[in-house]
C-alpha cells in the first residue's frame, strides 16, 4: 500500500480500517506492506504486527525492524538513467546488481520503482535479479510473464 500523504496519519487510518477485517489481518498468507511516505523505522514498533514495511537500501535496520520488512525497494533512477532500449552500461549494471545482491544478503526480495515499463526492460530486470517487477501495465506484464514460461 503506497502511502501518498503524511505517513503516520495515513498509516493510523489504514490500520483502523484494516482492523475491521480480522480475517484479513490474521491471514498468514497475506502480507500487508506499506510503502511510500512511511514513518521512520524507529516508529514501526507502534504498528500492529500485521503491518509490514518496504525497506530502503543503505539503511541499517535493527533485528526487530528487519522482521517487519517485506522487501527492499528503490527508485531505479537513483542508480541508472537507462531508458530500457539502449544498452545498459557496465557501470550501471554493476550498481544495480550490487543493490539487488545487498537485499538478497539479508534475505529480502528486491524491486525497483520508476523503471522503464515494457517487455525489453522487464527482461533486463529479470536478468539483473529483481524479485518483483513494478508496473503500471499489469495486463502487459501478465501477458509477458505467461509467454516466458
Where is each model-derived feature located?
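Catalytic cores of phosphodiester-bond hydrolases, prominently lipid phosphodiesterases
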Residues: 1-149
Amino acid at each position: 500500500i503506497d502511502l501518498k500523504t503524511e505517513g503516520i496519519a495515513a498509516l493510523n487510518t489504514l490500520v483502523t480500517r484494516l482492523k475491521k477485517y480480522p480475517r484479513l489481518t490474521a491471514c498468514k498468507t497475506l502480507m500487508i506492506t506499506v510503502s511510500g511516505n512511511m514513518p521512520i523505522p524507529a516508529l514501526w514498533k507502534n504498528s500492529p504486527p500485521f503491518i509490514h514495511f518496504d525497506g530502503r537500501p543503505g539503511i541499517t535496520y535493527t533485528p526487530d525492524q528487519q522482521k517487519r520488512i517485506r522487501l527492499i525497494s528503490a527508485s531505479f533512477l537513483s542508480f541508472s538513467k537507462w531508458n530500457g532500449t539502449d544498452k545498459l552500461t557496465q557501470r550501471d549494471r554493476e550498481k544495480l546488481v550490487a543493490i539487488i545482491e545487498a537485499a538478497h544478503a539479508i534475505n529480502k526480495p528486491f524491486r525497483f520503482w520508476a523503471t522503464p515499463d515494457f517487455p525489453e526492460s522487464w527482461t533486463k530486470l529479470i536478468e539483473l535479479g529483481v524479485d518483483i517487477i513494478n508496473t503500471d501495465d499489469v495486463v502487459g506484464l501478465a501477458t509477458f510473464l505467461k509467454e516466458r514460461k
